Amino acid sequence: MNKIHLQKEAQHGTPQFRFQAFSQRDTCGQYFAPYHWHDEAEFLYVTEGSITLRTENSTKLLTAGQIYFINPGTAHALFGNSEVSHHYALVFGLELLSFAQYDVCQNRYLEPLFSGKLLFPPGDTFEPETSVQIGQLIAQAEQLYHNTDPAVPASLSIKIILLQILEILFSRQAFLPSGDNARWKSSEEYSLRPVFEYIEQHYQERITLEQLS
């Protein structure tokens, strides 16, 4: 039996550009992304059907037209909920958006995100026009990511798009304060993490619910 990796150890993208985009289509209602977490943000946009997103604290049914923001370090899983579904996912390290020269933008908007003082909002309750606006940007970023035309400045365009999404969120005052101890910066493990780690260490053994409790 192969060792089951419950935590994604590898960073997405490349060291030169920590960004990766996915277009996930399910035609049999069996889409499944098992519980995992990473130190990168993840943006979701459902374009067809519906999927179920489960995190440590909530279960969300995301339907066509909805977006969702997953903060770095949040354990999550995705499940197909309709016979046919499609969604985009963007995964990237927040430092991708950092400026070489420290300025008011870095200080006022980006640094609170990098430090964990501000968290992305869930996004599933946004007004339809906001969801469409952000969703279209997510789709554009995914298409650019897979564009192999060397004449297209894809990485630059993707970075601009991500900043545009942040601009929309800041203009709507949508970011959430995290308190003094940022959730994803904390040295404490989430309640699910010890469970995942125990399974990973004992995957060849018979595991009971009592052992996981």
Model segments located where?
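Structural motif
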Residues: 50-52, 59, 75
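Short acidic-glycine-tyrosine-enriched beta hairpin
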Residues: 57-72
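A hydrophobic/aromatic-rich effector-binding and dimerization subdomain
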Residues: 2-24, 75-147
